[in-house]
A protein has these predicted regions:
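Conserved active-site alpha-helix within GNAT-family acetyltransferase domains
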Residues: 101, 105, 112-140
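Small/polar loops that bind or transfer phosphate-bearing groups
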Residues: 11, 109-110
Length: 171
């Protein structure tokens, strides 16, 4: 997704400070789990940024669990000055498209505060810790955060939006 002023793209090393600052804001609001700069540096290839006028104003991570054919949507944060503009929904759709392109069967996320957002805007459904890959479940249980597990199967075809039917009518 891109236009003159807005774009979603993979995060680069030069984005580490901006991504870290976005995540820190989410941590202060108790919306996100703390990430160190070192962790970001190690996993920057998992992150995507949403830019406005070439400035990152939102981020999301897609952490792969290839042995389980699952991917985790994590660390999603939108600068409050850019909220209610559909950026979060676009980040979810972008991460989902990346997960589908890589052949993952399930996208999952953990949330303590945005459960309704992920269900209503992201198309996720409530899951259980049993839906998590074993490595992720261990970390979930150690964290003690008691986040809600949300899952989204990626094996079904993408549903078309209302008013955009793809029927094979002869014209």
């Amino acid at each position: 997704y891109a236009n003159e002023y807005q774009a979603i793209r993979p995060a680069l090393k030069k984005d580490i400070r901006a991504v870290h600052n976005l995540i820190q804001r989410g941590v202060r609001n108790e919306e996100l789990v703390k990430r160190t700069r070192a962790e970001l540096e190690r996993r920057i290839q998992d992150y995507f940024v949403f830019e406005v006028d070439r400035n990152p104003v939102a981020c999301v991570a897609l952490h792969p669990y290839p042995d389980d054919n699952k991917a985790e949507l994590a660390s999603m944060y939108v600068d409050p000055r850019y909220e209610n503009q559909g950026i979060g929904s676009r980040l979810i759709a972008y991460a989902e498209a990346q997960a589908r392109a890589r052949g993952y069967e399930t996208l999952f996320c953990l949330s303590t505060q945005a459960v309704n957002y992920f269900i209503h805007k992201g198309g996720f459904q409530l899951g259980t810790p049993d839906d998590l890959p074993p490595l992720r479940r261990e970390a979930y249980e150690r964290s003690g955060r008691r986040s809600q597990v949300l899952i989204k199967p990626l094996t079904e075809p993408v549903k078309s939006l209302p008013g955009t039917s793809h029927s094979d009518s002869a014209s």
